[in-house]
């Protein structure tokens, strides 16, 4: 008799359809955002990184190489499926002479630090943004992250001091 009851429970469990699992209605579920985080955000981040590096004077090939490295490091930190890092800033330190120093400090850059200051900070991320301690986080999309100045402006003022400004625009 006990064997028959167990068999009935298994049959009932197999009849549960995936559509009956309320993933969208569950505010703590991350499945609806899986595609957005793992596909859309890295693609846009890579394009913006390459665009910014080209504007700084790198060749297209060099910009593509640096853009790949930077975006792979940061997006891997943002993906829960790949574990994330302990600290994104130390992971990205020294990735390139343009991105390694921080606070808008650049080597041999004739135009301005403003472009670098914008998209470097958005690529690096932060401890809060990658949700290291909170296990049931509400995931973000690329639109919710600070938009780099590379995507917001087309002209830059040479010699403008950006260290006292926000990295992603003025309110």
Swiss-Prot record:
Induction: Expressed in the late phase of the viral replicative cycle.
Superkingdom of origin organism: Viruses
Transmembrane segments: none
Cellular compartments per GO CC: viral capsid
Intracellular or extracellular location(s): Virion
Coiled-coil residue windows: none
UniProt entry keywords in alphabetical sequence: Capsid protein, Late protein, Virion
Quaternary structure and interacting proteins, as annotated: Interacts with the major capsid protein.
Function, in words: One of the minor capsid proteins that constitute a network internal to the major capsid proteins and outside the lipid membrane. The minor capsid proteins glue and stabilize the capsomers.
UniProt protein name: Minor capsid protein 3
UniProt source species: Paramecium bursaria Chlorella virus 1 (PBCV-1)
């Amino acid at each position: 008799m006990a064997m028959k009851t167990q068999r009935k429970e298994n049959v009932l469990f197999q009849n549960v359809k995936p559509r009956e699992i309320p993933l969208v209605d569950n505010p703590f579920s991350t499945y609806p955002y899986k595609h957005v985080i793992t596909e859309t955000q890295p693609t846009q981040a890579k394009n913006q990184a390459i665009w910014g590096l080209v504007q700084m004077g790198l060749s297209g090939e060099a910009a593509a190489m640096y853009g790949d490295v930077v975006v792979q490091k940061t997006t891997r930190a943002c993906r829960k499926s790949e574990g994330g890092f302990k600290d994104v800033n130390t992971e990205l330190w020294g990735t390139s002479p343009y991105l390694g120093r921080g606070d808008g400090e650049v080597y041999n850059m004739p135009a301005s630090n403003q472009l670098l200051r914008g998209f470097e900070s958005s690529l690096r991320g932060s401890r809060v943004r990658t949700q290291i301690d909170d296990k049931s986080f509400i995931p973000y999309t690329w639109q919710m992250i600070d938009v780099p100045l590379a995507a917001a402006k087309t002209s830059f003022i040479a010699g403008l001091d950006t260290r006292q400004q926000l990295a992603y625009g003025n309110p």
